[in-house]
Design a protein with these regions (language model features):
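Short linear sequence signals and composition-biased patches located at protein termini or domain-edge surfaces
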Residues: 35, 147-220
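Extracytoplasmic beta-strand-rich oligomerization domains located immediately C-terminal to a leader/signal peptide
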Residues: 1-151
Length: 220
């Protein structure tokens, strides 16, 4: 249980982890990332990502089709650039995200991938020219402890508080929970965040407590 949550959290978009209350941890997942071309060049491929005005596409350095299937950028995914998790650069609010429109195409040698997006002016460029990819089928995830059960909720409309799980519908990760506590320390760490999870299970009068610390990369 804890290991699965740790795997999920390590893939979280930088600066997207939050704990609305100690019974819930919420984050924006990512499936992959890449580097965008900064400047146009003559010939194809040659489209840089423009930060001075709304743009509808850019070139990624490298091949999309060469990636594992679950990491390939697809129609409906979201491109996120330099998420700081603050006003004006907050992926939860769509400040710095744009939806991929259509299937990315490749050309050139070495290969570059042309990614078409919904018109967007990204507020801030990445110092390392990086972007992250949020899966279109799972744009936000939360783990919620409720009524002695640990749920994994996904792809719901974002709000300032974790949504209540729907028993019988929301996927169950674990049952027989006795206590559950999530703590996140990220704002006072320059590059990394720390998620602390304490979960106790009780069954047949016996209690087992699992404690885990997960270091997450907050470099956008």
């Amino acid at each position: 249980t804890v290991r699965r949550m740790a795997r999920d959290l390590r893939k979280a978009l930088p600066n997207s982890i939050q704990v609305p209350n100690n019974q819930c941890v919420e984050f924006i997942p990512t499936k992959t990332g890449g580097r965008y071309r900064v400047e146009d060049k003559s010939g194809a491929p040659g489209t840089g990502l423009d930060f001075s005005a709304a743009d509808t596409g850019f070139n990624m350095l490298g091949s999309n089709s060469a990636r594992p299937a679950d990491q390939q950028i697809a129609d409906g995914d979201l491109i996120a650039v330099y998420n700081l998790g603050i006003a004006g650069s907050n992926a939860y609010n769509g400040d710095n995200t744009a939806a991929v429109s259509g299937t990315p195409s490749e050309s050139g040698s070495p290969a570059e991938t042309t990614i078409t997006i919904a018109s967007k002016q990204f507020p801030l460029p990445s110092g390392s020219n990086r972007f992250h990819v949020i899966p279109g089928t799972e744009k936000v995830v939360s783990y919620i402890c409720s009524g002695g059960t640990l749920y994994r909720n996904a792809n719901y409309a974002y709000s300032s508080s974790c949504p209540a799980p729907t028993p019988g519908t929301t996927p169950v990760i674990a049952t027989n929970l006795d206590t559950c506590n999530f703590v996140y320390n990220g704002s006072d760490l320059q590059r990394n965040g720390l998620v602390q999870m304490t979960i106790s299970f009780t069954n047949s009068g016996e209690t087992v407590t699992q404690y885990h610390e997960i270091h997450v990369n907050n470099t956008p």
